[in-house]
Amino acid sequence: MAWLADYWWIILIILIGMLINGIKELRNVDHTRFLLNKPKLPPHRDNNDKWDDEDDDWPKKKP
């Protein structure tokens, strides 16, 4: 761990460089083109649909 005490500034420079490169790459993302060409999501599967109406303990809404 003595090397960490001696070279902490190199690790800090590397982390700052990674952060700056990440920000630059995120700025290059064209979100409008992605939203226009977004793939369709499959329909939602409701895994509780067979229990939805059976033995409903909640009171019914009165009109």
Swiss-Prot record:
GO terms for cellular component: plasma membrane. It is a single-pass membrane protein. Its main location: membrane. Keywords: Cell membrane, Membrane, Transmembrane, Transmembrane helix. It is found in: Cell membrane. This is UPF0370 protein PC1_1167. The chain crosses the membrane at residues 3-23. It comes from Pectobacterium carotovorum subsp. carotovorum (strain PC1). Pfam families: UPF0370. The keyword Transmembrane applies. Belongs to the UPF0370 family. Coiled coil: none annotated. Residues 37-63 are annotated as: Disordered.
